[in-house]
Amino acid sequence: IFIDVTSLEVCSQDMIADICKAIPVMDGWRRTLPEGRLPEGGIENIRLFRTYTELYLRNHPDVNAPLDLIVTQKEATPYGIPVYVYFFIKDKAWASFERKQSDIFDHLMSIVPEFGLRIYQRP
């Protein structure tokens, strides 16, 4: 998923509260922070999206979570900031695998705006 560089920002407390209200799993994540406090200097919206992506996949019934599951961000390109997602689907039947993987990426792409981010689209 390529993220539009111009949509990156450090989240305000209000923005984080809105994200946690809209996406309950993120509120659970916030409660795991030491004393409920954010890291010094704040936290970026793309980092919250990566955190959400990992939580979503680890709890998805079709994902084989005990196997490698990696959500990583690479260097910015002319097409935006790539967020790579590596995971394994439990079902190995090709058609079912493709359908489940597509459903997961549909969800991830549709939730990007909740984090104040935009998917890069070439003009």
Task: Tell me what each language-model feature is.
Residues 1-123:
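Structured, soluble regulatory/oligomerization domains located on the cytosolic or IMS-facing side
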